[in-house]
Amino acid sequence: MSDFWVHLLVYLVILFGFVIVSVLLFIWLERRFIGRFQLRPGPNRAGPFGLLQPIADAIKVLIKEDIIPTESDKGVFWLAPLVAFVPVMLMFAAIPFADGAMLVDLNIGILYILAVSSVTVIGIFMAGWSSNSKYSLLGAMRTIAQEVSYEIPLVLSILGVVMLTGSLSMNEIVKAQSVPFVLLQPLGFFVYLSAAMAEINRTPFDLLEAESEIIAGFHTEYSGMKFGLFYLMEYAEVLAISAIATTLFLGGWQGPLLHPVIWFITKVLIIFMFIIWVRATIPRLRIDQVMAFGWKFLLPLSLANLVITAFEILAAPDMNTAVLIGINIAVMFGLILLFSRFYKLGGGRVSVK
């Protein structure tokens, strides 16, 4: 029994260290690449290539004064960062970095991840409500609206993968991918990545902390370590959705020659680079556009993906893989083009009475 607890403690320390180091690396990579996209060098003073800049920023946040608003609900205000941060860390318990390299191999792993990830929004709402600030509360309400709008297409996109594998275990889903599911489920991958970016409030869906509208949104009144926890939470969520996308659609740790962990990290970095590219390319949407995109565009596409997956399983179980991949990619582009004709993003002036 003692050996079990020792192994558990060691794995938890390694996992926590991996997440923290990855978050610091992600922050540095994002700032460097955003700088390149904007024709500037990015951070390049603190250490070689600016590698020490995230560490310097972390130290700065830790020594900042911890300010608590006078009229805030102090207990809830203090607890909110923990309620938001801890569930994100718990998500990594069921993500396999290699065959069996996970804290616990749950037979309902993906269901566990979806359930735990939903708790984060409670922490965000606690922060917005307890701050006694209209900007914080507005940011929190936007979070609730986005969570409701994008959780459904997110779950439906994952359901397509579950239908192909017949398992909810993350480890079994990876082993079932003799061909990466991004080729067999291209539409599901598109819906998952779009909905996941909206759920973690990345550009162009970053309305809950839109600086030009509501200052910093739900964490406007936070400073010091509490603000640092929210900042860590945001980038840990990016790492989590990249790891989940890698597991469900990119074959997880599988790949030739290199060590499985190296393959896993490489695929996670590819997803993260794509998220950075989207941030540097697409402007922030309005709140009505974000809601419409989820309900009028992603939800029908996710339902269509389920119907297509069910048809392929029942009617064409022995179809040549290359032909199936070609059909799926063609259907994906066709459906996106079709629904984009019906769905209008909106724009121009909006009259306010």
UniProtKB/Swiss-Prot annotation:
Keywords, alphabetical: Cell membrane, Membrane, NAD, Quinone, Translocase, Transmembrane, Transmembrane helix, Ubiquinone
InterPro entries referenced in this protein's UniProt entry, alphabetically: NADH_UbQ_OxRdtase_su1/FPO, NADH_UbQ_OxRdtase_su1_CS
Keyword Cytoplasm: no
Highest taxon of source: Bacteria
Any GO BP annotation: aerobic respiration
GO cellular component term of the entry, any: plasma membrane
Transmembrane segments: 8-28, 75-95, 108-128, 148-168, 178-198, 229-249, 258-278, 297-317, 319-339
Reactions catalysed according to its record: a quinone + NADH + 5 H(+)(in) = a quinol + NAD(+) + 4 H(+)(out)
Gene Ontology molecular function: NADH dehydrogenase activity; oxidoreductase activity, acting on NAD(P)H, quinone or similar compound as acceptor; quinone binding
Protein location: Cell membrane
Enzyme Commission number(s) from the entry: 7.1.1.-
Function in brief: NDH-1 shuttles electrons from NADH, via FMN and iron-sulfur (Fe-S) centers, to quinones in the respiratory chain. The immediate electron acceptor for the enzyme in this species is believed to be ubiquinone. Couples the redox reaction to proton translocation (for every two electrons transferred, four hydrogen ions are translocated across the cytoplasmic membrane), and thus conserves the redox energy in a proton gradient. This subunit may bind ubiquinone.
Entry's family note: Belongs to the complex I subunit 1 family.
NCBIfam families: PRK06076.1-2
Protein name, entry field: NADH-quinone oxidoreductase subunit H
